[in-house]
Structure formats: structure tokens, C-alpha cells
């Protein structure tokens, strides 16, 4: 009898980087990140075969999109190389999905190593279904077929227009969590325990960085696991020690990294951020996501060539970020506009100094105008900035929401742009188990 759970569901939130963009790249500074109620959901279950038929296959479906099925074979590599995953052809061509494929290799390798000594353990074939809440993607009503939380989109996943809410980190985190919950008994992994969350965090960080091909700051994975938090990044060298999946020693190196508390100098403080009663964090979609990689490189080049000036600016921006969060924590709503504007002032200064449009003029104009709408305390261009979704702090009532929607409709018509208030809201909770009832019609 297998120890695994037959069919389970988990979800992980997206993120909005309210304060600490760019600063998060340096361990001297911290970031303040909020989770969102837009979630990436994964349902994991067995594949049922006829008697005598044995499969070693993982099937991954993303039924909201066209041609979105990936099939993978897997086997145990020699010399401690872990579980090697190979994409199988579906239809006329292979469409790679590096985030899914890498996560499978990492998660299955870890699972096989920690549970492999148990006689009842086996990595049986499984089917995974990915469902993304609608606000992860820009879309017009005419483009989609609505089905509650999960729209059907008439495009392939690669052609979907993301809204910048952190879908890759939420995907890797929820995918990793679903595999751990599905295959491992609760005495080896519990999604609700501190130890379980630490295991999930470390494993998802490793998989996400490998899938990206670089070591990022990790704030998006940390938020997907823990929810809203103050975050100080881990040393990039933490993840330099792992060979590729299938290469000798991969399994041992991965388990040592995931289970070794001393390896991680990351700091995630959940209690350091709160949202006052009656205030909500909302997002505006500006319908043209930024290419943040080039922007980050330019800002870091400026910092490197101007060490003294950049340190002075970053120290002051860190101080202003902390004052904004302290104001939120204290529930001092009247002070929010002043504190938000103080942060924005330094962000524009950094953008000007580095010649990077962190808060472009068009976004400045829109944020300034939105801040005059009754019930809106202010807003920022979150994260790395650019022409992405805006984050607003506003009164949490229907009247304010309607005023903002009317304002944006008028603004879009006058300026000839696409901008709208998303349904998504800030949320404190991170990864969690879900009831299968939520996914009726999709499973």
C-alpha cells in the first residue's frame, strides 16, 4: 500500500512588491512584499491504468489555455543523479516548459531520497492540473470564456499577456507543494508546519532559480510560501553548489541544501507587515508588462559605478520604506499619503540617476491623478517598476472601488490607453491546502 495521498489540491499566492524594489537584491536591505488573493492552484492525483500496465509518467495539464499539456517520463539516474525528467512528445511538436520540468526534477528527487527507504514508497505516475486565477493575465471580456475563478483563454500559454503578479514563483511553489503533499506521508511533510514550510521554501527557491537560469533574490517564492512578509534575501552563493539533475551527486547536494538550516541566511518575518482595518491593497493593470531584466541590469550598473551616491540614496529609501510600513502597522491611515509620496520621490530620484524608467512619467501622471480620488490613499509602481500593474492603497468599500473604476474608464478613453482595476486584493496568507470542491468542473 502506498503512503501517498490519492487526490489533493494546494494553492500559492502571487505577490505585489509594495516597497523595496532593487534594494532587495542587496542583503543590507529588506523588502516589504504582500501576498495576493490571486492564486496558482494545483490538483495532484493518480493516473489510473488497466491491470498489469505500469507507467512512469507525469502528465501536466493547464486546461485554461490552448495546447497546454506536457507529458514527462522519469527515471532514477545513476551515481546519485536523482530523478531525471524527460519531456515526451505530445502532438506534432514539443513545447518546453522549463518551470514545470525543472520543478518536477527537483521535487521528485527530494521525495525519492527522503522517503525511498520506506518499503511502501513508490513514485507512481501522477496527473497534475494547473489552474490560475483570472487576474494573472490581461484579457478583455470578449477574449475569454468565464467559468467562475478560472477563465478559458483562446491563446497558448506562451502568448498569454501576464499582469506581473508573480506567476512563475507561485507556480513553482504550488507545484512543489502539491508533489510533496501527494507523495509524502504527513510525518515526513506537512504543509501547515513550520518545518514543512521551511522545506517547501528551500526546495522551491532552488527549483525556481534553476528554471530561471539565475539566482534571483527569492522574494517572490518566499511570499508564495509564507504570504505577506518583510524579506531579506539569502546569499546568492547558497545555490551555487548544486549540480544539474541527472549529474552525479545531485540528489545528495539537493537534500543537504533543502534540509540544512545553516545553509540559508534568509530572513522572512511574517509579523512585520499588517494591513489596517478598512484599508485594502488593490492592483491596476496597465496592460503592457515590463522587461525587468534590462532595467535591473542598468540600475545595478549605476550602483556599481556610483557606490557612495547610490548607498546614500538606498539608505534613505530603506528608511522611507520602513516608515511607510510602520504607518500601516500602526493603522495611522491619515499619514499614508505623505509616507507613500516620500517613497515615490526617492524611487523617481533613483530612476533619474540610473536613467531607468522605474516610475515613468505616464505612471507618475496616473498615480498622481488616482491619489486625488476620494478614498485612495496613494499608490506605487511596484517591484522593479516600469509600465506594469500599479499597486494602490485605498479604502476597502464598494463606493471607493466604483469611484476608481469610473475614473480609470474615463482616463483610458481620454489617453487612449488600456488601464483597469483588477479584482485581486492583498492577502496575508501563503501556501495552503484547498478543498477539491473549489475545482468542480475542472477535475
Curated annotation (Swiss-Prot):
Task: Spell out the protein name for this chain.
Answer: Phosphomevalonate kinase ERG8
Some GO term, biological process aspect, for this entry: which one? isopentenyl diphosphate biosynthetic process, mevalonate pathway
Q: Which residues form a coiled coil?
A: none
Q: Which Pfam families match?
A: GHMP_kinases_N (PF00288)
Q: What class of enzyme is it?
A: transferase
| Induction of expression | Expression is regulated by the Zn(2)-C6 fungal-type transcription factor FgSR which binds directly to the promoter.
Its annotated function is as follows: Phosphomevalonate kinase; part of the second module of ergosterol biosynthesis pathway that includes the middle steps of the pathway. ERG8 converts 5-phosphomevalonate to 5-diphosphomevalonate. The second module is carried out in the vacuole and involves the formation of farnesyl diphosphate, which is also an important intermediate in the biosynthesis of ubiquinone, dolichol, heme and prenylated proteins. Activity by the mevalonate kinase ERG12 (FG05912) first converts mevalonate into 5-phosphomevalonate.
One annotated Gene Ontology cellular component of this protein: peroxisome
What is the organism lineage in this UniProt record? Eukaryota, Fungi, Dikarya, Ascomycota, Pezizomycotina
Q: Does the keyword Cell division apply?
A: no
Q: Where does ATP bind?
A: 160-170
Q: Please give the catalytic activity noted in the UniProt record.
A: (R)-5-phosphomevalonate + ATP = (R)-5-diphosphomevalonate + ADP
